[in-house]
Amino acid sequence: MSRRPARAPFAFGGVEVAAGRRHELSLPISQLVTGADVTLPVHVLHGREDGPTVWVSAAIHGDEVAGVEIVRRVLERLQPTQLRGTLLAVPIVNVLGVMAGDRYLPDRRDLNRSFPGSARGSLASRIAHLMMTEVIGRCTVGIDLHTGADRRSNLPQIRCDLEDPQTRALAEAFGAPVLFHARLRDGSLRAAARETGARVLLYEAGEAWRFDEYAIAPGVDGVLRVLAALDMVDPADVGLTEPGPDAVVDAPGPLPGEVPEERTTDVPEATDATGEDTEAVHPDVVDGEQDSPYLVWQSTWVRARADGLVHLDVSLGERVSAGDRIGALYNSFGRRLAHVKAELTGVVIGRTEAPLVHRGDALVHIGGWDT
């Protein structure tokens, strides 16, 4: 009986990683003013058998640390000897932002608006170029991990092109409560990666600067489910005891269930609605049972109509109807200034966690079904 020939090593960063092995590399980015090197950390897991090449990245914004923990836990559960294909994991893309405790780079550029970048451009452009040439350009599928901004929390959700059948199948495999059809933004990692032909899932969950278990645990399982859907791992080998959802409900109108008694529904005012745990349970997340993810085709932020203190009556994952009273704004004397009302029928996919707001501040992000 002839032996199967050994899989060729994977050349990366000047190193050849043998089949069935893992290697940690640091790709040079720049230097600090002290002369200390700044490098991009990359884990290479080169499977013993052939399969796709996939990347997972986190902390493209320096305050989005939950993704770093997701990558750590995913790597704990993966063995390259059981892997088919190759995984490139980048736990921190915006190294300088993380070092400085800042969402952005020292030059105040948003790294996620700097792709595909240039080898001779700004610092942001150079980091983007390094990611594109060394990581993204070698992969057919990618998962980019994000959280909400400072003092904003997000319901776990996948943002992607739901009109592409292959991308949608991977999004369904991930198993997040919300699948959000999101347009591509110029300069984003996702847009640049799509130009290479790669399918990309963007996972949004939790809040900046926090290890929210309700965001991390589903993210870990979701990444592993995608690898299983690509036949890169066997579910039992990576601790997946339950498969992801096998059906997606594309709701044409309000979701089943009654409006909670304490909430009042008004006739909608004339507004522009187009504007814009391990039991992983956030204290606010998901009102009632939910068997399948929500498909979200549009969204709107409800904004503050006055300056003051906001009290919100809706939680992440809660269903609302246009016109519902979902909170109120008060002044410092405790007098109510305005009701906060839903401008769209759908599900709460994000909300502010800041009690002090100014007129025009984003309060509640609602995802809706209508295209």
Model regions: which residues?
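Structured catalytic-domain cores with a bias toward divalent-metal coordination
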Residues: 1-371
